[in-house]
């Protein structure tokens, strides 16, 4: 498989919907220690609706705009901070694929680059500040490296997940700078950031399509 057609996007994101349903309680528990305790609910609700939102906004000749429109609708479903960050990633990633009919090797890298830009733009955050970005940015860097090495679409996706895992691990040594996590900064040492974990699960969910 070297490309994903626009009409296959709902199935691609079904893996994300499934993984967040499975990890809902785990993410809520992590978030209860460092935040509001609703992260798992937000992720399962938002990404749970995304496959249907993609279907409803499907344009088989424009994969990018399909994602942009679905991302906008997703933002309305989960208007919380993390919901907004995740849906902004979908929208900005979609903008990178405007007028594309399919997602191949280059398009996957471009989508991830857009996802990073969406998080940065909406969250006003940078790498190293213990956020979702600390999983997605190293994932994008790993994807780019795999692409440059001539890896297949499946291999690029696998590299993306590995990059995110390393990013999540690195958050254990980072100090939180945003939200309620700042109050619990002393407890953060040695514990992965829950937002970064959500980013890893997003990518692992996408990876299920290739299994």
Q: How does the language model describe each region?
A:
Residues 1-211:
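N-terminal loops that bind phosphate or other acidic moieties
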